[in-house]
Amino acid sequence: MTPSFIYGTAWKKDATTELVKAAVGAGFRAIDTANQPKHYSEALVGEALKDLAAKGVSRDSLFLQTKFTPIDGHDNRVPYDPQLPLKEQVRQSFESSLQHLNTDRLDSYLLHGPYSYPGLSDADWEVWGALEDIHRSGGAGRIGISNVNQLQLSTLVQKASVKPAVVQNRCYANRGWDREVREICKANGIMYQGFSLLTANPPVLRHPPVVAMARRCGVNPEQIVFRFAMQAGMTPLTGTTDARHMQEDLKALEIELTPEEVKFIETGGGTP
């Protein structure tokens, strides 16, 4: 299953269960989370999945993605023993995620972010090796990485035994919508997931040409940005907590921008 739109669950806290159920009720079939209690409530996603299963929404109908978060991304709530070797940390976090999510497999498992910048470190390679093992054992259909730069991704593509199948990055219009990383993804058949498409780009939502596109399509500027992302080859994430916005966001699947409109936004015309 390759999703066209993903519901993100960061910062939902105690509302996570009800929001995930609302998102699936609205029509989302892909859920993104992380085993990072500082920002995510992964176990509450699992509670939602349990409730949904009882109502006939099968696990097989959903794309489920979570992440291994390195120690620097945690507060004092760490889902693994940080004194263990990195491969064991990944294994503990992965098994904890399966338990939280009431599943025996993931559709996608990501490294939440590299251990070092601008290149990859020995720690990154050790963790990637652990993700490869999980993929080979059938625990995750795809493996990938989030918050990655062009150098890191190109190195991973060139040298990894199991190539990344997913990249998830924040997208800024004034930085070309992460063009360099997206080009690597396109050339290598990697699913590019874009997050913060709205919150990182408020000027785009107010830009008169984008507002005019929304008027032409009978939607709002937010849906134009999501549709642009789809037509530019991204799989967008939304983390809205508003049930009406969930339904509105999904309308992006029903509209079509012209190639000229896509190019206009992608090449900076959508940025005032």
Segments (PLM) and residue ranges:
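Structural motif corresponding to the early beta-alpha repeats
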Residues: 60-87, 112
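Beta/alpha (TIM)-barrel catalytic core signal, keyed to glycine-rich beta->alpha loops juxtaposed to Asp/Glu
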Residues: 13, 113-272
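Acidic (Asp/Glu)-rich catalytic clusters
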Residues: 22-25, 46-63, 98-104, 135, ...
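A structural motif
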Residues: 28, 103-106, 140, 164
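Active-site mouth loops of central-metabolism enzymes
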Residues: 3-15, 76-88, 116-121
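Active-site groove signature of glycoside hydrolases
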Residues: 98-119
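Short, acidic/polar
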Residues: 12-24, 83-101, 151-154, 176-177
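N-terminal binding-site loop/beta-alpha segment at the start of enzyme catalytic domains
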Residues: 1-62, 66, 130, 200
